[in-house]
Curated annotation (Swiss-Prot):
Alphabetized GO MF terms: acyl-phosphate glycerol-3-phosphate acyltransferase activity
Record field: catalytic activity: an acyl phosphate + sn-glycerol 3-phosphate = a 1-acyl-sn-glycero-3-phosphate + phosphate
Protein's job: Catalyzes the transfer of an acyl group from acyl-phosphate (acyl-PO(4)) to glycerol-3-phosphate (G3P) to form lysophosphatidic acid (LPA). This enzyme utilizes acyl-phosphate as fatty acyl donor, but not acyl-CoA or acyl-ACP.
Bilayer topology term: Multi-pass membrane protein
Gene coding for it: plsY
A Gene Ontology BP annotation from the UniProt entry: phospholipid biosynthetic process
InterPro entries according to UniProt: G3P_acylTferase_PlsY
Highest taxon listed in the record's lineage: Bacteria
Top-level class of the enzyme under EC nomenclature: transferase
Pathway annotation: Lipid metabolism; phospholipid metabolism
Record keywords, A-Z: Cell inner membrane, Cell membrane, Lipid biosynthesis, Lipid metabolism, Membrane, Phospholipid biosynthesis, Phospholipid metabolism, Transferase, Transmembrane, Transmembrane helix
Official protein name in the record: Glycerol-3-phosphate acyltransferase
Binding partners and assembly: Probably interacts with PlsX.
Pfam families: G3P_acyltransf
Organism: Pectobacterium carotovorum subsp. carotovorum (strain PC1)
């Protein structure tokens, strides 16, 4: 392993450790996502406690902190295997952030950003897979699970040299979703539409006149 590859993995982990959900909620005066909603500091939980704009902001930053280190490593000539390890390091930072007592999110958006530099065709397929699954099922977690399962096959088709590291990344995402998988199996998982309604109801109560 070269010094460059090792350095990029360290940088990727530190970038991943910057929790945009926690920081944005602090700046915006929103509740700590680790202590409200699902307890997960990620875009989906921020959607529940802060609304669409807050969730979109967190989503963009979570994608970028996976994308930028991998792109930088690619520009520096890091080999495919270590590019994959750089991507995994960014996701590990998001999941176990050193700056936030190692309590982070599930790494889906960061993983998506880390895979994006492989190619825009792959990025489009991954986006389409997630969106289609969510639209058909209503479950954001199921979209992440299906995308993680199918990602190695997409990568094998477009850029086979990245298949192994992407498969490792997919395993990491699936492990982080074991609770969601159990809730889906038992029919207890909350649909994303319900999260939007729960956010809207308190706002309606605040703005409605007293009877």
């Amino acid at each position: 392993m070269s010094v460059t590859a090792l350095g990029m993995m360290l940088i990727a982990y530190l970038c991943g450790s910057i929790s945009s959900a926690i920081l944005f909620c602090r700046i915006a005066g929103l509740p700590d996502p680790r202590q409200h909603g699902s307890g997960n500091p990620g875009a989906t939980n921020v959607l529940r406690i802060g609304g669409k704009a807050a969730a979109a902001t967190v989503l963009v930053f979570d994608v970028l902190k996976g994308m930028l280190p991998v792109w930088a490593a690619y520009a520096l000539g890091v080999s495919p295997l270590y590019l994959g390890l750089t991507a995994i390091a960014a996701c590990l930072g998001h999941i176990y952030p050193v700056f936030f007592h190692f309590r982070g999110g599930k790494g889906v958006a960061t993983a998506f950003g880390a895979i994006a530099p492989i190619g825009w065709d792959l990025t489009g397929l991954m986006t389409g897979t997630w969106l289609l699954t969510v639209l058909l099922s209503g479950y954001s977690s199921l979209g992440a699970i299906v995308s993680a399962l199918i990602a190695p096959f997409y990568v094998w088709w477009f850029k086979p040299q990245f298949t192994f590291p992407v498969a490792m990344l997919s395993c990491l995402i699936l492990m982080r979703h074991h609770d969601n998988i159990q809730r889906l199996w038992r029919g207890q998982e909350s649909k994303i539409w319900n999260k939007l309604r729960k956010k809207k109801q308190p706002e309606d109560e605040k703005t409605s006149p007293e009877e």
